[in-house]
């Protein structure tokens, strides 16, 4: 019995942590519920008064917005009941709230995304709430289509964008999936140029290193048995000769290549 209670408590703690961020929840992160909050109200004639029920819903911490008066800042769901008598100001008679530190369950079906909040304390009683989000892409805000409050259970049905899956554009912004293939290909084109430049740089460095090693080896062989000063003088002399002869060597190579090309073109012209 003790172990079962401990396990249930541990699961509840994990659930509480996940409840704070929809983007970290495997199911909620697929939906637009993290983008919206809603404040809906219904009005009933209760002679001699008028009763107004308000419901504030802000499931995800990603959407930061101030709640209405009498609701707490960390409420996921808050219900207010106001009673208005003729000629008098409204009186708030009921406040029930479900904050982000309570347990929850998430269920997705073909018709709706359902979020069940568990164990909100209201006086001496404990209540659960079931929020059903139905998708409607044509609506800019969620609207409350039905609500019931009975037997320590509250059920609200909302229709609007919160119950809709995120679009491909949202996935591209978040870097999810393979939807950004075109953008990736465009980003790879400059990488090819950078790769060619990098290859040439490495080739130049290898050639420079090979030349340096060659000059050092030749200088060492020519001054073997001598002092370091002899080696240094030999190395400087050979390096200087190499640098001074390099331009002439390059010109000779270029002239030979161009001369061969000219000879080939001349041969073709003669034919």
UniProtKB/Swiss-Prot annotation:
Principal location: membrane
Residue ranges of the TM segments: 198-218
Protein name: Autophagy-related protein 27
Single GO BP term: autophagy
Xref: InterPro entries: Autophagy-rel_prot_27 (IPR018939), Man6P_isomerase_rcpt-bd_dom_sf (IPR009011), MRH_dom (IPR044865)
Organism whose genome encodes this protein: Saccharomyces cerevisiae (strain YJM789) (Baker's yeast)
Basic and acidic residues: bias regions: 166-189
Localization per record: Cytoplasmic vesicle membrane; Golgi apparatus membrane; Mitochondrion membrane; Preautophagosomal structure membrane
Assembly notes: Forms a complex with ATG9 and ATG23.
Residue ranges of domain MRH in the record: 20-166
Signal sequence interval, chain numbering: 1-19
């Amino acid at each position: 019995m003790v172990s079962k209670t401990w396990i249930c408590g541990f699961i509840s703690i994990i659930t509480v942590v996940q409840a704070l961020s929809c983007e970290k929840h495997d199911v909620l992160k697929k939906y637009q519920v993290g983008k919206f909050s809603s404040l809906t109200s219904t009005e009933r004639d209760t002679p001699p008064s008028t009763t107004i029920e308000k419901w504030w819903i802000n499931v995800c911490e990603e959407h930061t917005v101030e709640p209405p008066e009498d609701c707490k800042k960390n409420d996921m769901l808050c219900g207010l009941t106001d009673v208005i008598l003729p000629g008098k100001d409204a009186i708030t008679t009921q406040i029930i709230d479900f904050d982000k530190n309570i347990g929850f369950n998430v269920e997705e079906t073909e018709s709706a995304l359902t979020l069940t909040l568990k164990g909100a304390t209201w006086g001496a009683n404990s209540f659960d709430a079931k929020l059903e989000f139905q998708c409607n892409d044509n609506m800019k805000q969620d609207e409350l289509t039905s609500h019931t409050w009975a037997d320590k259970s509250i059920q609200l049905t909302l229709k609007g964008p919160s119950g809709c899956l995120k679009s491909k554009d949202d996935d591209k912004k978040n870097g999810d999936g393979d939807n950004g293939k075109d953008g990736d290909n465009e980003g790879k084109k400059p990488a090819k140029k950078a790769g060619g430049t990098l290859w040439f740089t490495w080739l130049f460095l290898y050639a420079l290193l090979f030349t340096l090693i060659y000059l050092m080896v030749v200088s060492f062989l020519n001054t073997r048995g001598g002092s370091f000063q002899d080696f240094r003088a030999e190395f400087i002399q050979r390096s200087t000769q190499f640098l001074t002869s390099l331009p002439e060597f390059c010109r000779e190579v270029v002239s030979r290549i161009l001369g061969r090309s000219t000879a080939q073109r001349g041969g073709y012209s003669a034919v």
